Regions:
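Conserved donor-binding loop and adjoining core beta-sheet/short helix segment
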Residues: 1-55, 154-186
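Flexible, substrate/cofactor-facing loop regions flanked by secondary structure
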Residues: 107-173
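Acyl-donor-binding surface of acyltransferase catalytic domains
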Residues: 44-108, 185-193, 198-233
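Short glycine-aromatic motifs
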Residues: 2-4, 8, 84-87, 151-153, ...
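Conserved N-terminal entry element of GNAT/NAT acetyltransferase domains
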Residues: 1-6, 97-117
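Structural motif
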Residues: 15, 80, 115, 147-148, ...
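Hydrophobic, Leu/Ile/Phe/Ala-enriched alpha-helical segments that form helix-helix packing faces
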Residues: 1, 41, 56-60, 83, ...
Length: 233
């Protein structure tokens, strides 16, 4: 017997009269399609997983359910997959030095453009379109383009076909014409940054082929990731 009560954005769960723990719900103002969950259970019993999340999904208006986990959280991962969740996205975080770099320095001519220019605005449009495309099937952007642009750095590297928003040591957003032309472009960006800094950082989602091309220029065997699990409605 599964007993679920809901209070202050938190589901309290008991099984056969014994408290199992809680699952907190929260929302993301920029991605409002899914209902977000944070798991805090004492016991991840896979035999109750399917019934539990079906009940939660019904309560939350049949929205897709989304959970973010570290790839190291194996017990929670087994629990979610037992309920029908699917890993839809892996996000890899990088802090790298020249010693991690596997490629040559690119020879592409780079322009550095700043906020307030026409080319910067074109870059904003390109990266917004790209972001929408690669995340559409997971958790679509539901806020305005203006809101998205507020989070972009003020400086862009470009060769007029490929774009990298950069803030100090961080490559924050990338997009490109295609993977091949992006390769030589991003090699030039990496070379430029390593001339300025000992270390650079970036994130790469495996749903984004352009960002993964950036990641492929560095060593990352068996790298841990932040994984997005989704239970479709």
């Amino acid at each position: 017997m599964l007993d679920i009560s809901y209070q202050a954005n938190t589901f309290h769960i008991s099984h056969q009269g014994r408290p199992v723990g809680s699952i907190q719900t929260y929302s993301n103002p920029y991605h409002q399609t899914n209902a977000y969950l944070r798991l805090d259970l004492a016991d991840y019993d896979c035999t109750i997983a399917e019934q539990l999340f079906q009940s939660l999904q019904t309560f939350l208006g049949e929205k897709p359910l989304q959970v973010l986990l570290s790839s190291a959280e194996q017990e929670k991962i087994y629990f979610l997959t037992a309920a029908g969740f699917v890993c839809k996205r892996k996000c890899y975080e990088f802090e790298v030095t020249k010693q991690d770099y596997l490629s040559q320095t690119g020879t592409t001519n780079l322009n550095i453009v700043r906020k307030g220019t026409a080319l910067y605005q074109r870059a904003c449009q390109q990266v917004f379109n790209h972001y929408q495309t690669v995340h559409q099937d997971i958790n679509p952007w539901t806020a305005s383009q203006e809101e998205f642009e507020k989070g972009l750095p003020d400086l862009v590297y470009t060769d007029s076909e490929n774009w990298a928003f950069v803030e100090n040591i961080e490559i924050a957003y990338v997009c490109g014409k295609d993977e091949q032309s992006f390769d030589s472009f991003i090699q030039a960006v990496i070379g430029s940054l390593f001339e300025q800094y000992e270390q650079i950082s970036f994130e790469a989602d495996d749903c984004d082929p352009i960002a993964m091309r950036l990641a492929d220029h560095f060593r990352f065997p068996n790298k841990p990731s932040w994984d997005t699990y989704l239970l479709e409605s």
